[in-house]
Amino acid sequence: MAKAIPKKGSRGRIGSRKSIRKIPKGVIHIQASFNNTIVTVTDVRGRVVSWSSAGTCGFRGTRRGTPFAAQTAAANAIRAVVDQGMQRAEVMIKGPGLGRDAALRAIRRSGILLTFVRDVTPMPHNGCRPPKKRRV
């Protein structure tokens, strides 16, 4: 086997490639299902800046769907963007889960000024047949 000849002057990248950019305004998406709550923070163009979920915060199983898990997930996602200088945000809430209000409360407590809160839960215009009711 022939040895690979090292290229001259090919040292690795010295700094990180991405620069931390200031984000004064953003959009916070909360997706609250019965099993989990996912909080995604984007800039106004839709590029993801930070995200967190109840699962990534260490909650497993049925505890992921609790309001406390949603509150922790929202606080983790917001902490990163407050450091980048976010002051104002719009909130889009989707889903029927228990974590809707708890995540919104955690965002309000973070000090970010909310311009508006919008419910974007998809509603069918009598589309697909829903699953049968559970019998426990």
From Swiss-Prot:
GO terms for cellular component: chloroplast; ribonucleoprotein complex; ribosome. Disulfide bonds: none annotated. Keywords: Chloroplast, Plastid, Ribonucleoprotein, Ribosomal protein, RNA-binding, rRNA-binding. Signal peptide: none annotated. Part of the 30S ribosomal subunit. HAMAP family: Ribosomal_uS11. NCBIfam families: PRK05309.1 (NF003698), uS11_bact (TIGR03632). Belongs to the universal ribosomal protein uS11 family. This is Small ribosomal subunit protein uS11c. It comes from Guizotia abyssinica.
